[in-house]
Amino acid sequence: MTGPGTHDGEDLPRLVEVLGALSVAIDLGLGQPAEHMLRSATIACRLSDRLGLPPEQRDTVYYSTLVMWIGCHADSQEYARWFGDDIAVRHDAYLVDWAGIPYLRFLLGNVAKGEPLAQRLKVMGTLFRDAHGQLATLVHSHCASAASLAQHIGLSPEVATTLAYTFERYDGRGLPVGASGDQIPIEMRVAQFADIAEVHHRTFGLDAMTAMARSRRGGQFDPAVVDAALTSPEELLAAAPDGDEWKEALNWAPDREVRLTGEHLDRLVCAIGDFVDLKCPFTLGHSRAVATLAAAAGERLGMGPAEVHTLRRAGHLHDLGRLGVSNQLWANQGSLSPSEWERVRMHPYLTERVLDRIPGLGGVRTVARAHHEHLDGTGFPLGVGGTMLGRSERTLAAAVAYQSALEPRPYRDAMSPQQARERLRGRSRAGRLDPDCVDAVLAVAGHRPSRLRRDDLLTPREHEILGLVSRGFSNREIASRLVLSEKTVRNHVERTYTKIGATNRVGASLYALQHGLVTHLNDPD
């Protein structure tokens, strides 16, 4: 018997395998090697046992550690504004204590890094005019986003609550509220230590990790957690017995035997696609739209249900690898250097590497990897073409090209449907895209209304505001664009957030996704 949404013979993955792969995608955005968060989860569970935590708390520790930084990609746009390369600064932040002079020195060294001196001084002035307030706002947004995304992918309320304390410190000098001591859930106190300890042990060795733990005892970390960790630290940090860190980490999962139904998997891949799209404001709703277009085009081409299902899932997951490329590149308004362009071209390969972790999604992985390949071999990452690309790969490539054209990019405005159609036809005539797949994508796109419904909850002006906020515009930029005062914009934003129950840009973006407003929000002016 098969579950809802399951096709006969379909070998579906376990829940923890999908979430484990998601953690590898999170590693990409942290600038850490694959399996960092998985290994941190293993360390955290071992530490939980040393502390005598009951099973239900250890379960929360596991998933809180595994997806601890799920919110970091949602605020990549903001990080890039302050620090330039969001991935590089996150990588380097692991090496400093986040308080006092060392952290101030770290901030000074990374604000607007790589920009001309005048621009650096301008950004520094803006940030340090109210450094605590600016960082608290950023951290609050991160924590709210992490909690929302955790629930969006089906994790427990306990995990969502724990993630709100990610940036707090035992000594009360953390953010966003300055919680201290036992005000911070023990699950987060354990997760924080495991996350940092894994990096220092892997990078500098056991002695350096031990010195780091002692120096931060009672400051960043709970003394009881540090003391438990430093009792035989070599055992706590030991590699998996057979060297398979993936297997070791998954064995600690509380629901390690839970296998997904097809319907549950579909909800999960949709949520993961939404999560990826939040990395850049201008890609909001991209993966959902691509999945819908590609699946409908596949049906029009006469594909069977299983092939269409694979195509739809590939549409949701095709851009996972974008998490491994800095927003500094995605937001570039000019030309990329050869090395920068090479990093961008790697993102489909990174998608493949992440999906390779999930049993039962081999077909999805193959199709998703090829979303930028061309029939004439001029695409990337492999440059394959012709018979090397199946019908599903060709259909996804056409759907991605069409949907991307409809969306704004930092270097161009969104195209009209007519302009997107001509762009697609041109690529078909040039031999890059399959003519039949292009025809199918354009046919199904032509049957869709040009604008999705508005939500009656919001006024037309609030719809405008929601669209601009979701696309990453600041209040000042919105005021300039709409010829309003900043105070008026701020009032509109506050009313809109109150109406939709959001507290930040990510919450507003998710609301727009869940209520079918994204096509309207991405319409060109």
List the predicted regions and their residue ranges.
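Short, locally clustered residues in the helix-turn-helix/winged-helix DNA-binding domain
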Residues: 277, 467-471, 513
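Histidine- and acidic-residue-rich, metal-dependent catalytic cores
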Residues: 2-457, 463, 519
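Recognition helix of helix-turn-helix DNA-binding domains
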Residues: 473-507
